[in-house]
Design a protein with these regions (language model features):
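Short acidic, Gly/Ser-rich segments with clustered Asp/Glu that frequently serve as metal-coordination loops
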Residues: 4-6, 64-69
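Short conserved beta-strand segments at catalytic cores or DNA/RNA-binding microdomains
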Residues: 1-24, 28-29, 40
């Protein structure tokens, strides 16, 4: 999670698909574990079980209490089968998730520390996410994450993912 200060009601959940440097970010208000589970359920509902499994085979996170619903995150509500694996990094070892740390660094350009994010809307955050999709990335030979995503998957899946 990316928050600004502890008094904020809003939090930004950030995910990245590392092979494509493809970020997804979601604005959440006072999120609990069930809200994180619902976020993953919404993605699976929009893109389907097989696409979810291909896109997110592994979710690597810190030990944030909002990721404690392990079965809710890893088991499909659609099929009842495992949709992904969930692993937790060791405490204070950010080097275990460098792609997430890099994404959070990029997000800080839009959402600086010590600046409240409580007045943001989901639409504001979606615009930031889409701008990250079309920004060339060095590790992708200056292609964009959207280019990489649509080449590997499809434009149709890209649009479904952003619903």
């Amino acid at each position: 999670f990316l928050g600004s200060i502890t008094t904020d009601n809003n939090t930004i959940l950030s995910l990245i698909q590392p092979d494509m440097q493809f970020p997804l970010i979601e604005l959440m208000t006072n999120p609990k574990a069930i809200d994180v589970t619902k976020f993953f359920d919404k993605i699976e509902y929009n893109i389907g079980f097989d696409n979810f499994k291909r896109l997110f085979p592994v979710i690597l996170t810190d030990r944030d209490p909002r990721f404690t619903d392990i079965d809710g995150i890893t088991i499909s509500k659609i099929t009842g089968a495992e949709r992904c694996k969930l692993f937790f990094c060791d405490p204070y070892v950010s080097s275990q998730k460098p792609n997430v740390e890099n994404l959070n660094k990029r997000l800080r350009r839009y959402f600086p520390k010590r600046k409240s994010i409580d007045n943001l809307t989901k639409k504001d955050v979606k615009k930031v996410c889409e701008s990250l999709h079309i920004k060339p990335v060095k590790i992708l030979d200056h292609y964009t994450p959207k280019d990489a995503f649509t080449k590997i998957f499809s434009e149709e899946l890209y649009n479904l993912l952003l619903k």
